[in-house]
Amino acid sequence: MAQYTISIIIPVLNEAAIIKQTLEQFQDSEVEVIVVDGGSQDNTVAIARQMARVITIEGKGRAGQMNAGADLARSEILLFLHADTRLPANFIELVTQILDRKNTVAGAFELAIDGRDKSLRWIERLVRMRSRWFSLPYGDQAIFISKKAFVEAGGFADLAIMEDFEFIKRIKKKGKIAIAPAPVTTSGRRWQKLGVWQTTLINQLIIIGYYLGISPTKLCNFYRGRGRKKL
């Protein structure tokens, strides 16, 4: 089995409350960690600089932040991680095994949502089915890909939202998308804030809107709550 170097790219914006916990998981790891700040107004940058390489890219959105991190990455493999998400302990082994597979261009992990609400377990099952049946993981599942393949694909499209969805749909044409048999654990904060089923409904409406050709900027405003009445 080949041994690859891995760069973890974490786009952030006002994540001071959680970024330290996220970065601590890499303290005893040999991976490169790049935090790409989008113009935080809190202590995110100061905290992150103690534990990772930090750059600031304002006004580019998450897609621009991830592309900037990828440009600077020194490793063979890129792994894009949300600021509120933890990887499984053996993620290096899993990433290496998957990208060693013939005709596999990229991968991601299953999803576990931090929270006791039983309905979250249903969401996890639905994510597992969508990811495995349709090879369609989302960004909160820690997408990983070789830097060479990422560059050849043109990186993430400059979209206000759905950049992960668009990217996966595009690279599926170049090879298989594999799902690692272990979950990342992501914060349940968004589900807790709006409620599990309302959050799920909003997510599905965003996808439908994207397929209908509604502009990503309008979809992003809807997702963030701007211009959205209580459902």
Task: Annotate each PLM feature.
Residues 1-2, 169-231:
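Hydrophobic helical membrane-anchoring modules
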Residues 9-28:
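Short, well-formed alpha-helical segments that are part of the catalytic scaffolds
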Residues 17-21, 42-50:
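Acidic helix N-cap motif at the loop->helix transition within catalytic regions
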Residues 25, 37-45, 85:
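A conserved acidic beta->alpha catalytic loop
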Residues 31-34, 45-72:
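Conserved donor nucleotide-binding strand/loop of the catalytic core
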Residues 43, 83-97, 169:
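Acidic donor-binding/catalytic loop of UDP-sugar-dependent glycosyltransferases
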Residues 78:
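Short aromatic/hydrophobic "clamp" motif used to bind/position activated sugar donors
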Residues 89-119:
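Conserved donor NDP-sugar-binding/catalytic core segment of glycosyltransferases
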